[in-house]
Amino acid sequence: TSRRQRQMCIRDSQLVLLYLFGNSIIASDMFLNMFTTNSGEAFELLDKLAPAVVGVFLLYLPALALAVYSIRRTETLTPLFQKRVFMLAMLMIGSGILVYTPAHRKYPHTAKLDNLYPINAFNNARFAVDSWEAAKNYPRTSRKFDYRATSTRDTELPEIYIFVIGETSRARNWGLYEYERNTTPKLNAMPDVIHFDDVLTQINATHKSVPLMLCPADALNYNEIYRQKSLISAFKQAGFHTSFLSNQLRNGSFTEFFADEADCTIYFAAPKNKPHLHDDVLLSAVDSLLNIGKTKQLIILHTYGSHFNYCERYNTDCRIFTPDHIKEIDHKNKQAMINAYDNSIVATDKFLAQVINKLDRTGKTSAMLYLSDHGEDLLDDERNRFLHASPIPTYYQLHIPFVIWFSDNYSTLFPDDIRQARNRHTTPFDSRVVFHTLL
């Protein structure tokens, strides 16, 4: 798609963004989400956003029809009409300058044109397109990056580490985090599971939050990511066989670039025109990897977790809270929406318990880490916020579950690690902790 076509697509989508995040500016990450969201995800959302979709048709179709009609009739505007429109435009511009000038003098650092709509929307759209284009050069800009990593442990010691990347899972709705519903019964019953109470994501959008878990860059120095490789490369240099299994589609983001660093990279895509596969599709591949005979392994599982539409993220055995189907996103359907979301957490709990059990049965030195990429708004308060990736995030979008499990062998060999984890489970962290913890 050409740059101009993308910008047109961005402009036409502003009404939908305004419907979702009406009290926020239209930020660059909103536009980047358009590039990294597949058609299936988009349809699942738009199917429940009738007012915004109808608004697009009511606003754009009549205007387009009138334009075509006028062109075919070769109609031209009269000089008098053109003069009046010009005078009105000059009056509006002049009024804006009169209002802006004293504000700029009093607050020179905040009263900028970049903060005005629609200038800020177009500027952010341009920034998003530029960022997307810059990402295409990543293979060249990161080519010389080298961790020079080596392992400090016995090369003959069997080690298996699985990092599960969650999707749209907020800590508030986990039973493990004292939620009123026990949405995590299996993890609650595992005494070796350690959860961290106060962990925030750096960014509330998948296309940025996941890569920042996997590399040294952080939200304050995001541009460093263009020159860095992920921890997958570090593990490979240290003698590990690496695998990246994803229940999400390729999207041209840094997540995809990092995934391709692995020795084994597999994307599980649903058949065309079918609902997205559930995360348990990854488990058979995990079984295969655990039996390939590699002494040291790093396995990364990128799940689809609790991504909207929530009721399509779990099997019937996880359908605990009902009703859980909605026709439209509004307050009258709020409880059903929460029921579906909670059921998706139940499915995540079951999935993680299965991963832990598989590791435990190997009898090897192993550990599992789980961290969600970001949380979610569920019409929680008077702001009526929904979804994620808004320019002004809420705590619901930022507070995420972070869970670690260690095998008995690991606990025996490295008791200090276990002690540190338990002693610091209430310490505030952000998602940068994953990169350093895994290494």
Give the role of each language-model region.
Residues 284-287, 325-368, 404, 425, ...:
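A long, amphipathic alpha-helix that forms part
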Residues 10-58, 105-122:
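Membrane-interfacial interhelical loops
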Residues 79-105:
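Internal/C-terminal transmembrane anchor helices
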Residues 236, 410, 415-439:
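Non-catalytic, well-ordered alpha-helical segments in soluble enzyme domains
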Residues 97-163, 168-328, 430-431, 436-439:
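Active-site-proximal alpha/beta segments of enzymes that process anionic O-linked groups
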Residues 162-163, 344-387, 435-438:
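Metal-dependent active-site segment of extracytoplasmic phospho-/sulfohydrolases and closely related
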Residues 178-182, 364-365, 371-415:
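Histidine-centered active-site microenvironments of extracellular/periplasmic hydrolases
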Residues 1-9:
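Single conserved hydrophobic/aromatic residue that forms the stacking wall/gate
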